[in-house]
A protein has these predicted regions:
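Glycine/serine-rich anion-binding loops at beta->alpha junctions
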Residues: 1-15, 94
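Conserved Rossmann-like nucleotide-binding pocket used by diverse enzymes
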Residues: 2, 65, 140
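Metal-dependent amide/peptide-bond hydrolase catalytic core
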Residues: 76, 83-281
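Acidic active-site catalytic centers that drive phospho-/nucleotidyl reactions
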Residues: 8, 40-41, 68, 162, ...
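Acidic/histidine-rich catalytic neighborhood of metal-dependent amide-processing enzymes
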Residues: 9, 13-83
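Short, basic/glycine-rich phosphate-binding loops at helix/coil junctions
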Residues: 1, 31, 186-188
C-alpha cells in the first residue's frame, strides 16, 4: 500500500482504530484507550502537553504501546535527542578586504569540524550499547546557512545540529565537550525528547513478545514519544508495522499488506490476552 505516512505511522493507527471498533462489543476490565498526539515529526511538540493529562483524565494504563515501524518486533529502547541551533557572528565588509573582517562562515565551519571531531571521540571512547545499530551517542550537524552575496563577508551564519544520546549519557555533558563559550557564537535548544530504556527483566515483555510471532526484543535508532510515557512511570513499549529503514520517510512511502495483517492480528490478540499477560507481573 503506497501513501505518505502509511509506515510512519498511520498503518499502526488504522489497526488500532479497527480494534477499537471491535471493542464496542466487548466489556474489558479496563478501557482500550487511544492517545493521538500532533507534530511528532517536527520535534515531539504535542506530546508534552498531553502526557501529564493521561493519568488524571484516563486513569493509569497497564501498558502504553507507542506505534512506530518496528516490523512488529517488540522495541524496548531508543536514544534520546536534543536539537540545537548555533548562531555564529562575524563582521560585514567588502570581500576585497576580507582579511580585515571576521567571517561568520569561518566560525561556523570551525564549529562543524568540532562536532565531527567529537563524534569520532564518542565512537572511540564513549558509552556503548551494542543493541543499537550505532552503539554510541552521536553528534550530527545537518544544516548550515550564511552569507548574502559572494562579495560580502558574512556577518551571521547558522548551524543546526543534534545530539542523539544513549540513556546512560546526559546530552548536556556531551554538549560541554564542544567550545560553546565563544563570544562569536550563541547556542540555543530547539527541541528535545527523552530516550527509552525499558526494564527488560519485566516478565510482561516475554508474554507480549509471544503475541507477535517475530524475533525480538530490539532497540531502534530513531526516536519516538515512548520516553515521555516512561518518564512518568508508565510501562511503555514501542511496536508497529513497517520498516523505518526501507519504507519510512521515503519519496514513495508504502507498507507491505502482510505487515498490516500482522499488526491487526497482534491488536486482536492483545485485547483478548492482555489480562493473562499482566497477571505475570
Amino acid at each position: 500500500m503506497i501513501g505518505r505516512g502509511t509506515t510512519d505511522m498511520k498503518g499502526f493507527l488504522a489497526c488500532v482504530l479497527a480494534q477499537a471498533r471491535r471493542c464496542r462489543d466487548m466489556s474489558p476490565a479496563k478501557p482500550f484507550m487511544i492517545a493521538l498526539s500532533w507534530d511528532e515529526e517536527i520535534g515531539c511538540r504535542g506530546i508534552p502537553y498531553m502526557v501529564d493529562q493521561v493519568v488524571p483524565f484516563l486513569g493509569c494504563p497497564d501498558i502504553v504501546i507507542v506505534g512506530e515501524p518496528t516490523e512488529m518486533q517488540l522495541c524496548l529502547g531508543h536514544k534520546g535527542k536534543v536539537s540545537y541551533k548555533a548562531i555564529c557572528y562575524g563582521e560585514a565588509g567588502h570581500s576585497a578586504l576580507a582579511p580585515h573582517f571576521k567571517n561568520a562562515l569561518h566560525v561556523a565551519a570551525k564549529f562543524i569540524l568540532e562536532t565531527s571531531d567529537l563524534q569520532l571521540k564518542l565512537a572511540k571512547s564513549g558509552a556503548r550499547d551494542d543493541a543499537y545499530t550505532v552503539p554510541y551517542s552521536t553528534v550530527h550537524a545537518g544544516i548550515a546557512r550564511g552569507g548574502v552575496a559572494l562579495n560580502i563577508v558574512p556577518e551571521r551564519a547558522e548551524v543546526s545540529f543534534e545530539i542523539r544520546h544513549l540513556t546512560t549519557e546526559e546530552p548536556a555533558n556531551i554538549l560541554n565537550e564542544l567550545d560553546t563559550n565563544s563570544e562569536n557564537m550563541k547556542i540555543s535548544t530547539v527541541y528535545q525528547y527523552p530516550g527509552l530504556s525499558t526494564n527488560e527483566a519485566d516478565p510482561v515483555w516475554k508474554s507480549l513478545q509471544a503475541l507477535t510471532n517475530v524475533p525480538g526484543p530490539i532497540k531502534v535508532a530513531f526516536g519516538t514519544e515512548a520516553g515521555f510515557f516512561a518518564k512518568i512511570g508508565l510501562r511503555t513499549v514501542v511496536i508497529g508495522p513497517g520498516s523505518m529503514a526501507s519504507d519510512g520517510h521515503q519519496p514513495d512511502e508504502g507498507i507491505d499488506i502482510d505487515q498490516l495483517r500482522k499488526c491487526n492480528d497482534f491488536c486482536g490478540k492483545l485485547q483478548h490476552g492482555l489480562q493473562s499477560v499482566l497477571r505475570l507481573n
